[in-house]
Design a protein with these regions (language model features):
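Hydrophobic transmembrane-helix bundles of small-molecule transporters
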Residues: 166-278, 285, 303, 311
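Cytosolic juxtamembrane N-terminal segment immediately preceding the first transmembrane helix
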Residues: 1-30, 44
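Central cavity-lining transmembrane alpha-helices of secondary-active solute carriers
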Residues: 58-72, 123-127, 313-325
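Helix-breaking motifs and short loop linkers at transmembrane-helix boundaries and internal kinks
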Residues: 45-47, 79, 100-106, 168-169, ...
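Extracellular/periplasmic helix-loop-helix junction of adjacent transmembrane segments
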Residues: 38-66, 106-108
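Hydrophobic transmembrane architecture of multi-pass small-molecule transporters
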Residues: 409-503, 512-529
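Helix-loop-helix hairpins in multi-pass membrane proteins, especially solute transporters
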Residues: 68-206, 224
């Protein structure tokens, strides 16, 4: 018995468990960003199309989002460490399949499905393991460290993807992830074992199935927008039906005294609803814009993956800077003010970017807009959790954290899906303008098909099939410029909605004791310090 207690004490003293779960957080976050810059090479290597790659990228985050709530419950039933290691195993198998992919189907199975499932199982357990391993003083540092590692992964993801794709192969990205998983397994004995906190009978399987179907149909509906509007509407309607079934079932389960997947009573908290919506919008804007800009740079400018990654650094770097400064700024200013400033900066960035895209665009042209977009959304994302869970009890905070992570991950999937569709729809609309200007007497249908094929393959076609080089360049310029304008218009409107939502936040819930204490010390600092010194002397 003493030996077991000593082992657990040693694990609490060691930072190795933190390093292991932080590594998992690193590769999961890296996975969501590094493949965007490899789109052109994926199309070439796997003999596929932009639409297929678009679907694969969207489904990776969708798989993670749809299973996040279920994974949060499973860790209480099976055990935090067990569910974390199971997720790592599935993730590692997915990385092997993705690295060896010979076609888009293999990549979909390995990356979108298996790595998505593995990431969903590991993500909730990462925070739970940290909270269960370290005491209050060390826990604050551990949580901040894991969060910072995730931020670094998001910032370097495009550059990492660009480097391995250009100088090695995108397959090495998955090989790197596999190496990290092997390290986690090699040192897994250092992670503390946690006893299950719930019985298997408490698992809400039906609610989990309803939630998965709802989210999958929602994203499929978005992806179908560019192909079949009627089918898209049908999918949206069915998704709403399943959402209603999910809500009704969860409320019925709660009324019967059973434990639901989600306690619907938690949504009475206005700040939680606002926080979920705000983070959802922020992730749509961020991941959607990264995808659209990557497509433009590789499709119109013929940038390789490394150059594409370099051009995305201002945005991802801005997110990292905001993440590092947000907590310090929140001691001085209210969350509502900071998040409003974040949305305003992001809107300015989107408006600037609207006028920058063309065949002669350079890094210096898009860097200011990308940086403003990144630093603004970084503030919003970093403060969104604190806004949502402030004042909740511990049990409610756990449920709320799962909902917030789900909304953020779903936002990533919807962002890639929606803005990818807008990019393609915008490009299609631009073809008519281009043909009218440069070849008014030509068969428009012929050039719509030709330009559409060109975009789907990101230029990996026989150039003679689409007009002369000069006319093709001019048409491509108009097509993609119009498409990027539409993307940035949509992004600005979306961010404006987010800005409006920040004004629904109850600021009283997020101004904590620390802010009030700082304000008091600013007004009475010298006197307060002297009084404390005098009191100390009197006691002596």
């Amino acid at each position: 018995m003493k030996k077991v207690k000593k082992m657990n004490a040693n694990k609490q003293e060691s930072w190795l468990p933190l390093v292991l779960v932080a590594l998992a957080s690193f590769i999961i976050t890296l996975d969501a960003t590094f493949m965007n810059v490899s789109i052109s090479q994926l199309i070439l290597d796997l003999n596929t199309s932009l639409s297929t790659v678009h679907l694969i990228i969207s489904f990776y985050t969708l798989t993670t989002a749809s299973l996040m709530l279920i994974a949060s419950k499973l860790q209480d039933i099976i055990g935090k460490k067990k569910i974390f290691m199971l997720g790592a195993l599935i993730y590692g198998i997915g990385a092997i399949i993705a690295a060896l992919s010979q076609n888009s189907a293999m990549l979909f199975i390995g990356w979108s499905l298996l790595e998505g499932i593995g990431g969903a199982l590991m993500t909730p357990a990462i925070i739970s393991i940290i909270i269960g391993t370290y005491d209050k003083n060390r826990r604050t540092f551990a949580l901040a460290f894991a969060s910072a590692i995730g931020g670094i992964a998001a910032a370097i993801g495009p550059m990492f993807g660009g480097f391995v794709t250009t100088f090695l192969s995108w397959r090495f990205g998955f090989a790197f992830e596999l190496a990290v998983i092997i390290i986690i397994f090699a040192y897994s004995k250092n992670i503390k074992n946690f006893k299950p906190q719930s019985r298997k009978t408490n698992f809400d399987l039906i609610g989990g199935i309803y939630s998965i179907i709802t989210l999958v149909l929602l994203v499929l509906g978005v992806l179908e927008l560019k192909k079949n509007m009627l089918l898209s509407i049908v999918l949206f309607i069915i998704s709403i039906v399943f959402l209603r079934l999910f809500i009704s079932y969860e409320m019925k389960l709660k009324a019967s005294g059973a434990i639901p997947l989600v306690d619907m009573g938690i949504f009475k908290n206005n700040n939680l609803l606002a926080g979920m919506a705000i983070r959802f919008i922020a992730m749509i804007a961020m991941m959607g814009c990264l995808f659209a800009v990557s497509v433009f740079l590789q499709g119109a400018l013929k940038f390789n993956a490394f150059d594409t990654g370099i051009n995305l650094i201002p945005a991802t770097g801005g997110v990292l800077i905001s993440a590092l400064l947000a907590e310090r700024l929140s001691r001085i200013y209210s969350h509502k003010i900071l998040m409003s400033i974040g949305f305003v900066l992001a809107i300015i960035g989107a408006v600037i970017l609207r006028f920058q895209f063309g065949l002669h665009v350079t890094f210096l042209d898009i860097a200011p807009g990308m940086f403003l977009l990144g630093i603004g959304l970084g503030l919003v994302i970093a403060l969104g959790i604190d806004v949502s869970i402030k004042g909740m009890d511990e049990e409610s905070q756990s449920t709320a954290s799962g909902l917030l992570t789900t909304s953020q991950t779903l936002g990533s999937s919807i962002g890639t899906a929606v803005i990818g569709c807008i990019l393609i729809i915008g490009a299609t609309a631009g073809i008519a303008d281009a043909v009218d200007i440069y070849v008014p007497d030509a068969n428009q249908t012929q050039f719509e098909v030709g330009t559409g094929d060109y975009l789907e393959k990101l230029g990996n076609l026989n150039e003679s099939s689409i007009l002369s080089q000069d006319v093709k360049a001019k048409i491509t310029n108009i097509v993609l410029t119009d498409a990027m304008k539409m993307v940035m218009d949509f992004t600005a409107i979306l961010l404006l909605i987010g800005l409006i939502l920040t004004h629904t936040i109850d600021n009283r819930r997020v101004i904590g004791r620390r802010i009030r204490r700082l304000r008091t010390e600013r007004l009475n600092g010298p006197k307060v310090r002297l009084d404390r010194q005098k009191l100390s002397k009197d006691r002596k």
